[in-house]
Amino acid sequence: MSRNLRTALIFGGFISLIGAAFYPIYFRPLMRLEEYKKEQAINRAGIVQEDVQPPGLKVWSDPFGRK
């Protein structure tokens, strides 16, 4: 196996590993917004935002909202 091919395979494997790690963290929630909105509504039910927000910080907004 040539040295360039081996380097390309190692680099490609590394990039694939990073992509596989980021898929469930970043890309899957972006593709399934409604599912994650429902899940977050269930997870955050009963939490009063003002009670958990540290004083002096901006109140957290909807992470799925677009600017």
UniProtKB/Swiss-Prot annotation:
Which sequence ranges are listed under topological domain Mitochondrial intermembrane?
28-67
Biological process terms from the Gene Ontology for this record are: mitochondrial cytochrome c oxidase assembly
- Which regions face the Mitochondrial matrix side of the membrane? 1-6
Q: Which residues cross the membrane?
A: 7-27
Phenylalanine amide-modified residues are F64
Name of a matching Pfam family? DUF4538
Q: Which UniProt keywords apply?
A: Amidation, Membrane, Mitochondrion, Mitochondrion inner membrane, Secreted, Transmembrane, Transmembrane helix
Q: In which tissues is it expressed?
A: Expressed in the ovary, specifically in granulosa cells of follicles that have passed the primary stage and in oocytes (at protein level).
* Single GO cellular component term: extracellular region
Subunit notes for this chain? Component of the MITRAC (mitochondrial translation regulation assembly intermediate of cytochrome c oxidase complex) complex, the core components of this complex being COA3/MITRAC12 and COX14. Interacts with COA3/MITRAC12 and COX4I1. Directly interacts with newly synthesized MT-CO1/COX1.
PANTHER family hit by this protein? SMALL INTEGRAL MEMBRANE PROTEIN 20 (PTHR34923:SF1)
Name of the protein = Small integral membrane protein 20
